[in-house]
């Protein structure tokens, strides 16, 4: 992907982005809705998940939450200041957002504690292998893909 990335308007307005980025968002919309509209999240919101299911979710999700700043650091290593305006934007955003992401591990630990999950249990990761798939995919994407693809894979 060699198209220059230049945002031309507000951050949260899709029309501010290059056509290839707009196409990416449009082509992913069905998949995005399938995830955000998944019954798991509605049941979680409504307090309808069993304690056992919540514990598995919290333990299985820990890997991604704890390592997310590391995925982002892989992408940061791909940037160099002044190579392109888009790369400069990505570099600045990554540096700022890594700091924000660091807090999420603390929040996750507190949430897990509310369900009786200890930090030792989070670290042990004794959950079904399927709960590790997202973490492996994020790590692989950021370690092997070019900047634009890796950032799209983990930050959209």
Describe each PLM feature range.
Residues 2-5, 11-41:
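Acidic, low-complexity proline/glycine-rich segments
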Residues 20-24, 28-31, 40, 72, ...:
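Generic structural signal of hydrophobic/aromatic residues within well-ordered alpha-helices
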Residues 25-36, 45-82, 99-100, 148-156:
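Alpha-helical bundle segments that constitute or directly flank the non-heme di-iron/ferroxidase center
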Residues 40-45, 80, 137-140:
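A short small-residue
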Residues 89-156:
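Active-site-proximal alpha-helical scaffolds that flank and shape metal-associated catalytic sites
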């Amino acid at each position: 992907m060699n198209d220059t990335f230049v945002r031309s308007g507000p951050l949260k307005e899709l029309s501010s982005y290059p056509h290839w980025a707009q196409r990416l968002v449009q082509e992913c919309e069905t998949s995005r809705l399938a995830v955000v509209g998944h019954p798991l999240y509605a049941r979680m919101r409504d307090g309808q998940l069993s304690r056992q299911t919540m514990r598995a979710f919290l333990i299985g999700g820990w890997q991604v939450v704890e390592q997310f700043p590391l995925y982002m650091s892989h992408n940061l290593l791909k940037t160099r200041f002044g190579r392109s305006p888009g790369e400069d934007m990505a570099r600045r955003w990554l540096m700022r957002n890594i700091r924000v992401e660091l807090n999420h591990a603390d929040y996750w630990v507190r949430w897990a504690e509310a369900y009786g999950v200890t930090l030792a249990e989070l670290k042990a990761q004794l959950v079904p292998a399927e709960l590790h798939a997202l973490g492996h995919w994020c790590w692989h994407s950021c370690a092997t893909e070019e900047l634009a693809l890796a950032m799209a894979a983990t930050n959209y």
